[in-house]
Amino acid sequence: MLAIIFDHTEICFTGDNIVPYRMYVPDVLMAFFFLSGYLFYRPEGFCLRHKLHSWLRGVLMPYFIFTSALALPKAWLHGADGSLSDLLLTILTGQGSWFIASLAVAELLFCLLLWLSRAHWRWLAGAGLFAVALAYGFGTRRLAFEANWWHVNEAVVALPSLLLGYMAHRFDKLGTRWRLGLFALLLVLSLPVNVLVASSSWPSVLVGAIVLPRLFLVKNALSVLLLYLLFTISQRDGVRWVEQMPRWLAAMVSWTGRRSIVYYFFSSGIPTALTAVFSRLGYTYRGCYAEVLVVFLLNFLLITLVTWAIYRYLPWTTGRRKPNG
């Protein structure tokens, strides 16, 4: 989520991506889908009714609440002159927030996949190959729903990441040595892929709201698995490396991660509004990249404050019944 806020800050404040978009944005987006799939797995088994209830409260309901509440301010910030009926149509067709809409569709598709396969790993392996083929077709625009309601194109592209996260959790039995070896192997494999993608001449395709470079499936899979291994590798005493972070930093990352849905709804609007305020005051980007970092920190603090207030005073908007600031 920090990477998404950083990307939106950079675009709003400087007018462009100074750090190449293709180098990290698609990866962190797919990492979110990977984490979603990871959280799907339960040792006691998959319950469709329970998961659909969680999906309705935790994803779909917040989508309608926040996109409805932010529709007019968002239109005003972007200078749009749409009518209320246009705004309503935008929300109902899933265009109010492309990422949350695609997450909702991808999770629903994955629910149906787990239900139909009875979560049997052999069926899931076969379905995974089919999902990869579909993702490649949609990710290269060989296949596409032209209307792209509820950003189904992006959802299909993300489906393998959910399955990868689910399988990673289900078969999470690797010891430290195996994790270190696999991490080193994936790191070596990722280096040439990232060098290729970093080239300005490397082709990419616009799929709905996301730009995907060629080899996106390979790059995304390598990146999310590297992140996963980095956060799960343990020392000899069983303490994970990530647990060696300063407590305040670990607490901040954990707190932010658990509230990512609300963070995302404000990750674009607040950077846009803050940039507009700075512009009115005569402060614009002057070529010093340190300014971007300062503005990013301000955006993160403001979004965190808003998110805290929502979880503290309006928890029902996030699917929770009790305050959880």
List the predicted regions and their residue ranges.
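Alpha-helical transmembrane segments and their immediate juxtamembrane cytosolic regions
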Residues: 1-325
